[in-house]
């Protein structure tokens, strides 16, 4: 479901822009500091309700302005155009509109506009803590399992409530009622995650064979507690330890995706360029599975396309992106870096000092 139009007002250094988009490749070209990343960041904000660069709303609103607006129109599978929009104010107030209706939730926005981001800081997916890989898994499950969002939200609330009760409970009996619901939901979420990783593992390995043929890369899922123990049993068994620590040690909030080469974590084996291709393989596999499972297409946002990639690797990535037939937004410092990807169906936009013009 590609975006056909993008309107940005008072976001970063962009005062205003209104551009018609290609359903294929869209290139944003400009020198460092010109605002090219801000265009991708605005699209990300439209789909996630937050920036991938800053958690502080005040930093993404243009200087001297009180609020920002991002509007888009995307084409539905039935070929209707649906307007979506987000407004953020300096006090943190956020308003989301879908189809002209206010009061929509950010989760609904994410469901409408599935985005995949590949950017220079994206190595965190494979090099940093488990929370990044949990977010990766849960993005995928969220988009293919309708009941996931409500179940996961409930698990987080129950875990928070349990941690509070651990500080005052005198016996496990005081937690047992809540733990029954928590355990049932945790097992359900775990099974959804297992199924999801099973689905994307083969696609990830196939793409890795093209990107990194010299390595045999394996994915394995850790659910957050030992496989042979039911979660209800674990909660009861660990009550005294959890009470002493003041929080719940194991559970679905500790899940991880382990990515290894011959038993060694990939971050200890691959170069930075190879790690970027590994991240790209994971993102492409997610997008492929989303299309197979739901018929929806991801929108790919690739910031600083040439970063860490030589010409050969850029061509490999471009080839796979074209095969997806998805809408793609790519930022680059020069047009030469993406010259072999530009065709008659793509669009090129040049940006300088926050001013955007079609090239």
UniProtKB/Swiss-Prot annotation:
Molecular-function GO terms, alphabetical: ATP binding; single-stranded DNA binding
Compartment(s) where it occurs, according to its Swiss-Prot or TrEMBL record: Cytoplasm
Keyword field contains Cytoplasm: yes
Residue sites binding ATP per the record: 30-37
Entry GO CC: cytoplasm
Main location: cytoplasm
GO biological process annotation, one example: double-strand break repair
Domain of life: Bacteria
UniProt keyword list: ATP-binding, Cytoplasm, DNA damage, DNA repair, DNA replication, DNA-binding, Nucleotide-binding, SOS response
Role noted for this protein: The RecF protein is involved in DNA metabolism; it is required for DNA replication and normal SOS inducibility. RecF binds preferentially to single-stranded, linear DNA. It also seems to bind ATP.
UniProt family annotation: Belongs to the RecF family.
PANTHER family to which the protein is assigned, alphabetical: DNA REPLICATION AND REPAIR PROTEIN RECF (PTHR32182:SF0)
Annotated protein name in UniProt: DNA replication and repair protein RecF
Gene: recF
């Amino acid at each position: 479901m590609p975006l056909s139009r993008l309107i940005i007002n008072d976001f970063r250094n962009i005062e205003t822009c209104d551009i018609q988009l290609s359903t294929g490749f869209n290139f944003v070209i400009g020198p460092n500091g010109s605002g090219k990343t801000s265009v991708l960041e605005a699209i990300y904000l439209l789909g996630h309700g937050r920036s991938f660069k800053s958690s502080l709303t005040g930093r993404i609103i243009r200087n001297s302005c009180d609020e920002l607006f991002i509007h888009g129109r995307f084409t539905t599978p039935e070929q209707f155009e649906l307007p979506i929009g987000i407004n953020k104010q300096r006090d943190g107030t956020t308003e989301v509109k879908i189809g002209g209706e206010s009061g929509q939730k950010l989760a609904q926005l994410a469901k409408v506009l599935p985005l995949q981001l590949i950017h220079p800081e994206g190595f965190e997916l494979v090099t940093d803590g488990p929370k990044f890989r949990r977010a990766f898994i849960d993005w995928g499950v969220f988009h293919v399992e309708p009941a996931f969002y409500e179940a996961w939200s409930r698990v987080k609330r129950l875990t928070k409530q349990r941690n509070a009760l651990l500080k005052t409970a005198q016996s496990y009996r005081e937690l047992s009622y809540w733990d029954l619901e928590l355990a049932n939901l945790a097992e359900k979420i775990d099974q959804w995650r297992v199924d999801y990783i099973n689905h994307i593992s083969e696609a990830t390995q196939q793409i890795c064979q093209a990107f990194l043929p010299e390595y045999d890369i394996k994915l394995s899922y850790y659910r957050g507690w030992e496989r042979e123990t039911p979660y209800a049993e674990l909660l009861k068994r660990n009550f005294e330890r959890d009470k002493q620590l003041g929080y719940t040690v194991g559970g679905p909030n500790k899940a991880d995706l382990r990515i290894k080469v011959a038993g060694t974590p990939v971050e200890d084996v691959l170069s930075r360029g190879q790690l970027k291709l590994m991240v790209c393989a994971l993102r492409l596999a997610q997008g492929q599975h989303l299309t197979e499972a739901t018929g929806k297409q991801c929108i790919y946002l690739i910031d600083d396309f040439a970063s860490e990639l030589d010409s050969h690797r850029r061509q490999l990535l471009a080839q796979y992106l074209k095969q997806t037939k998805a809408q793609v937004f790519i930022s680059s410092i020069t047009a030469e870096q993406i010259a072999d990807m530009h065709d008659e169906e793509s669009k090129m936009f040049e940006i300088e000092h926050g001013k955007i013009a079609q090239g």
